[in-house]
Amino acid sequence: MEKNLFELLEKGIASIDSTLCTDKVISRLRRLYDEITLFNPSYGLVNAEGRDLVIRHILDCLAPVSIICSSGKEGSRLADLGSGSGLPGLVLASALEGWDISLVERMGRRAGFLRNTVAAMGMSQNVKVIQKDLSEVQESYDIITFRAFRQFKDIISDLDRILVPGGKVFAYKSSEENIQEELETVSSYSGCRFSSEVRDYDVPMLDAKRRMLVLFKD
């Protein structure tokens, strides 16, 4: 990572939460940036590089960490669906010390990338990669996250199946996405009852509103 991008990353982390601006967190996210940059040309992980990768992806994934953190604690089980490039799963894992995190990714090459990157970031102890489609996942989780994944109408029953009672789903959304349609899917679901709310959050140095769609399993 070039010096100017490192300084940008450090500034962004401090703006989100000064307590996260530690050598360990910064080093992990810097390594994630380097791994994505190295493998992106071959794997097509994310359509961004340089400053855009730092702000629109890494910092965007980190920005709502306090919203997620307030719903769990050390030892909480979190599943990140469609992890692909590690966004947001590996970004969150860098900050959520002591959480038990599973990165769910069905594609072999991307699952391999995730395994290598978990090891490179020094997080093998509490982060594992599950190379399966969501429909095949059998474990249960306290918290589920995803970003740029499938629509709720395609996954709502699986979310219900693997989320414990009292658990929460955090779906990263841009302001342009049709959140109302997603909420209608949730309200019409005939399985368990989900409560929902939409939380806005800001990303440092990004002049665009971002939103988090939160589901609570009653």
Give a label for each model feature:
Residues 1-75, 79, 109-122:
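Class I SAM-dependent transferase core
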Residues 174-218:
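Active-site capping/gating segments
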Residues 108-109, 136, 150-154, 177-178:
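Short alpha-helical
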